[in-house]
Amino acid sequence: MKNKLITIILLLLNLSYSQVYTVGDTAPSDFGLPWCGNNTTGNDSLFLMDFNGTLNETGRPYVIWIMSFTSWCPYCEQEVPYTQDFYEIYADSGLIIIGMGSDWGQPYTCEGWVENFGLGYPIISDLDTYNEYEYGGQGMNLFTDTYVPSNIIINHNMEIIYSQSGFDGEAGMNNIFNIITSALDQCYLCTCSELLGDIDHSFSNEDEPIIDVIDLLKLSDLISSDDQINHCERGQGDFTGDGLLNTIDLFAFATMLAEGAFNN
């Protein structure tokens, strides 16, 4: 009953999406589809807002790559190993890859697709394939109305910066690689260092981080302010390792500074 209710909610949400979102458009953060593979969250559905730094709980933005595919598509099978390679390189650097599959059972189930290609990134199930659309399902028709594989890249501001259908071999994958690396380079919060104590990101002439009383003062300001603390600041200031920033972290930081723990 719970799964049926979630499906109905997703259907109602997506009825409002009549346009094809393309390059330059802002991707709809409330768009989501049911998880079907590599669900590590315990949630029934994955939404784009989970990776929107202005809406999610951590404040961490992501660069998002959506690959739309069908289980019968030979070109999708040729492309998918590249997606796993990208995932293994950039999973910890702010890239989220989402496989959006449809037409399951021809021949792969969702689980079979994940297992056969050894995928580690999330797979969602596109809904209503061919029921309301000439081709593909809700998700595919939100971003394109052509054919698979279809690749959409969304930057940390939730702007679509790339949208293309078809598999263009290694040359096409190299192009996607360049677009993704450029997008990550433009997103400090996607790839920032979470070095403990490095709050103000100052460096010596030898490019070594300088951790001193200025960092302590900035941590104090963060703790006393009402501003949202992003994931970088949380990692850099969480001296107790409890996932929170409070006066205990401030005291621990001050003690370590006094003891010379950060002296080179």
Task: Specify the residue positions occupied by each region the protein language model found.
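Cellulosome-associated attachment modules in secreted, modular CAZymes
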Residues: 185-264
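Positively charged n-region of N-terminal signal peptides that target proteins for export
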Residues: 1-4
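Thiol/disulfide oxidoreductase modules built on the thioredoxin-like
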Residues: 117-119, 127-179
